[in-house]
């Protein structure tokens, strides 16, 4: 039989575990700085930017994102994806400082975000983004592609919080997607 002090201790432990579970279940939105390209990647890509594309991309408003729920999940909002894209374009030298003078418009749509309902162990996230680059004057499509990238965040990265693992996997999948987009754009022939 439990004594009165151990009964109080047991109640406190149960209460503490319940509170920890509630806190771990809070939604964790993706963070724009974590989705943008790293400094080393940006510097490397910056050196490959052709003159015809340097400071010539205007980023249009991003679509398809979703706000993160209050209690569960790790979604990607339009505003955080917009910020990550804008900073990545700026860091690589593609972003047009004066949008009215940009030769091209970049249109981005978050088509699909595949996440597990609950990341029991590793969090495996796949993201599909649709990219379209059109001429600002004339509207001719220069580049159009759907890119799907996948990232897995291991259990040890955030053992107590499955939403944190999903957030980290989502951010890394977006970062990989942006890297692929920029590398493909730099390989195209651009008029000077």
Where are these regions (language model features)?
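Surface-exposed short loop/turn segments
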Residues: 27-37, 92-144, 151-164
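A structural "domain/chain start" motif
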Residues: 2-7, 26-83, 186-192
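Short secondary-structure boundary motifs at beta->alpha junctions and helix caps
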Residues: 67-76, 138-184, 191
């Amino acid at each position: 039989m439990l004594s009165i002090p151990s009964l109080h201790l047991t109640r406190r432990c149960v209460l503490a575990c319940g509170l920890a579970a509630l806190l771990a279940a809070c939604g964790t939105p993706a963070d724009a700085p974590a989705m943008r390209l790293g400094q080393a990647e940006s510097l490397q890509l910056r050196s490959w930017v052709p003159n015809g594309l340097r400071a010539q991309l205007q980023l249009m408003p991003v679509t398809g994102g979703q706000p993160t729920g209050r209690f569960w999940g790790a979604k990607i909002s339009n505003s955080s994806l917009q910020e990550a894209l804008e900073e990545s374009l700026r860091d690589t030298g593609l972003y047009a400082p004066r949008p009215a003078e940009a030769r091209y418009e970049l249109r981005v749509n978050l088509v699909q975000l595949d996440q597990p309902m609950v990341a029991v162990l590793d969090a495996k996230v796949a993201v599909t983004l649709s990219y379209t680059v059109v001429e600002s004057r004339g509207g001719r499509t220069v580049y159009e592609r759907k890119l799907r990238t996948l990232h897995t965040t291991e259990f040890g990265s955030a053992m107590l919080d499955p939403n944190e693992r999903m957030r980290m996997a989502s951010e890394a999948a977006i970062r990989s997607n942006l890297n692929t987009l920029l590398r493909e754009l730099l390989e195209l022939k651009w008029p000077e």
